[in-house]
């Protein structure tokens, strides 16, 4: 991304910033709640047995009330880092070890305005067909980079995504291929 930004700047497109969408989010993966039960020493904590694709089941304690067996959720295991800078360590809660944390959308750095109301509180529950053990950045589309480009009046050819794609292909020495933008009519006449 930095190389592309530098090359675009050299040809007259001022790249103001390069933004990594999942910056600071490291080691968080998708996991499945295989078992859940109340903590014996607390009325607000839950013991979750988690399969996050590592080949072993780990115990994670949570105070969230919206987690159920078979839910697929973001799991920050020991060694993970959240966008806040927090690094996950093994913790002891009311006498039991917790080897990670189940994450809310806010803890993943997702703006609440982008979420449905039911996704704003508690643990971020993912669709049931979400594969386990996958980097959460990939699942949520946060494994991408955004170039913020300030266009000048002399670069009217780049005021749309096609123009920017042509310019990017030119500076990278690759072929530009126009995307297929055909529309297929359905029986009712709506596309």
Language-model-derived ranges and their functions:
Residues 1-189:
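Phosphate-backbone binding interfaces of nucleic-acid-interacting proteins
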């Amino acid at each position: 991304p930095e190389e592309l930004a530098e090359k675009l700047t050299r040809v007259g497109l001022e790249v103001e910033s390069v933004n990594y969408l999942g910056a600071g989010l490291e080691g968080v993966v998708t996991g499945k709640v295989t078992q859940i039960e109340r903590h014996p020493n607390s009325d607000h904590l839950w013991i979750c047995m988690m399969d996050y694709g590592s080949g072993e089941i780990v115990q994670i304690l949570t105070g969230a009330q919206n987690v159920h067996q078979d839910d697929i959720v973001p799991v920050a295991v020991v060694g993970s880092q959240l966008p806040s800078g927090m690094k996950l360590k093994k913790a002891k809660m009311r006498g039991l070890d917790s080897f990670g944390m189940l994450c809310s959308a806010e803890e993943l750095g997702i703006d609440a305005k982008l979420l449905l109301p039911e996704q704003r509180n508690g643990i971020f529950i993912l669709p049931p067909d979400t594969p386990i053990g996958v980097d959460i950045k990939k699942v949520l589309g946060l494994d991408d980079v955004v170039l913020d480009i300030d266009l000048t009046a002399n670069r009217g050819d780049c005021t749309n995504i096609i123009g920017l794609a042509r310019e990017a292909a030119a500076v990278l020495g690759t072929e530009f291929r126009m995307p297929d933008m055909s529309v297929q009519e359905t029986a009712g006449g709506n596309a």
